[in-house]
Amino acid sequence: MIQGIDYAAIAPPLIVVLAAIALLLADAFDVPRRVLGAVSGGALAAALIAVVALASGGRRATFCLPGGLRGNGPASCSYVADDFTLLFQGVVLAAAVVVVLLSLREIADARMPAGEYHFLLLAAITGALVLVAARDLILLVVALETLSLPVFALVALRRYDGVASEAAVKLFLVSVVSAAIMLFGISMVYGATGAMHLDRIAPALQRLPDHLSPVAGVGVVLVLAGFAFKVAAVPFHFWAPDVYQGAPLPVAAFLSVVSKAAGFAGLTIVLALGFPAYGHVWGPVVAVLAAVTMTLGNLLALRQRTAIRLLAWSSIAQSGYMLAPLAVGPRRLPEAVAATIAYVALYAVMNLGAFAVVIGYGARGKRFAALDDFRGLARTRPAAGAALAFFLICLAGLPPGVMGLFAKVVVFRATVAGGVTWLAVVMAVNTVIGLYYYLAWAARLFAAPAERPSAPVLAEPGPAVRAAVAATAAGALVLTVAPQLVLQAVTAAS
């Protein structure tokens, strides 16, 4: 028998989904765009306050089933609001507030329907919030699809735009295939263990008969493949560059940060709580995925000449770094999970900041801003140029971008401590490769502005975009001064 619902535990996603419904209804009454944007941002801020309030209390859970044959054992819960969940929900909501700020001008310039845009965005955020709290495979899949489905529409919401429509179709097709692969894997895991809750799957896998072990192993790998799509790991990455380029830029930022963070949360939950007994199976798979992902992402980023495609391939390479600690398998798994989560949290600030500057200061009237369009930005707009240069240096992991260096050191240390030394060497080589394209773009910012007649005219950002750039820059500065705060919080949560 399922217990009553703990509404306090589900308060963050509940606030967001109620706001999404209210926005959809308000759009029918021709409410001004600014009001819709204010409601959207206010709902996310309220949900963030709810997360902070929950963090001051203890662990909460809901949708629970009694454990044991007679219902007298520990309960298995589908939704758990523990420190891990609240940490990720905080990251998702903080990043989502920045995405809303970046979206306000984009909605007006691209003449997108504001009500539909904010409804779809909040619906996707609801899926992300539930995903990081899910503790059974059914809720994980439902949350993952709740996150994915609105994004298809967001990518294509710029009507009469063939590039956006093509990107949406590509994202939809790849997502459908990956969902089918994951569902097939879940069915195999359920067939072998007879359980859907992760805390019941883990002991069931430990005592599995030999004839069911191959079935469970294949199921584990297929579930991993489904999450590999969400985090854009090679070879499930090929949707990312075209979708980032075709989508509205705030949606690309959402995919690069919020969607990726939720995907890594789901992946670590499944591997650490559900499949630790099969670490000898998924550990080597993750190691190969990490090595190939960071290598291909960095090599193809070297060839890019537009800002968004460079950020897309850079994001793919960063996924490889995030995967690397998980390659240790069951050995030192808590430390590996903490390293991955810390990297995700620090990456969210760095990458979202870079997107904010590109969105706010890209060449006016150009759909795809080239890297050369930002030449001299630090001379004409010193604050924006310095901010973008700082974000790029952080992503490269080079001082004075200490937060980026700290993130890479944490991941490198966890990988070496777990005994996957060859992967640490691959990561070190890829870090050197990444220095080239990050520093090449940063150098353009301080070069003399282009004097050719066709030189682009940079856009003037509105107050919302300026606030987004300022917020991410402030966060990056704080975490550069004290990056250990993130690792301490993550270690306590994991």
Report each predicted region and the residues it spans.
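Alpha-helical transmembrane segments of multi-pass membrane proteins predominantly involved
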Residues: 1-494
